[in-house]
Amino acid sequence: MKRTRLVVLSDNRTNNKLLQTEHGLSVYLECPSGKYLLDTGASDLFIRNAKVLGIDLADVDYCLISHGHNDHIGGLPYFLKLNSKAKVILSGAIPGTEYASMRRYQHSLTGDVDFSQDKDRFVFVNESSNVGAVKVYANIDKRNPLPLGNKNLLCSDAAKQFMPDNFIHELAFVIDGVLFTGCAHSGILNI
């Protein structure tokens, strides 16, 4: 039986002195059903770290974007240039929405992604569904309390006015029976 392999390509910290760090998350997943990239960090750092580790991201079948904050989606333009085949699964609530943090001072969390390019590669999900071998959970019901760190996070409404982030842009993924999430802003107990 083939096992699931998980390799952190980008994070705030690392124990591997050969890898660089950034405020961002990117995880390479090698599962029985295929090769996946969960989030793309804030820059192209995940690509540089993958090269150091001998991981060929051109072979990835699906890129899974957990939510719209730039430390998870910021590297997507670099990934799309490197990998010509992978479908990108993300929330349909991400395009056109701006994100910000009020922690210490207001600063943007909006990723710089042109969704009009490579349109055929994006799979926008608004309802829980299956995409290939991936079970995608959207519109996560928030029955339990949300993480306290969310209180400083904002998103824009249709009029581009900021309001508390409702995290309708957050997705969770189940691949081969394993749950994957980014920050779990919706609360891990809710996911």
Indicate where each model-derived feature is located.
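A general structural motif
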Residues: M1-R3, S33, D59-V60, K85
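Short Pro/Gly-enriched beta-strand edge/turn motifs at strand-loop
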Residues: M1-T14, K151-A159
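Conserved beta-strand hairpin/beta-sheet module of binuclear metal-dependent hydrolase folds
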Residues: T4-V52, D165-T181
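Short, acidic Gly/Pro/Ser/Thr-rich loop/turn segments
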Residues: R13-N16, L45, R143-L146, S186-G187
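Active-site metal-binding motif and surrounding structural segment of the metallo-beta-lactamase
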Residues: L45-G96
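Cap/insert and terminal regions of metallo-dependent hydrolase folds
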Residues: H69-H72, K87, N166-I191
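Metallo-beta-lactamase
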Residues: I94-E170
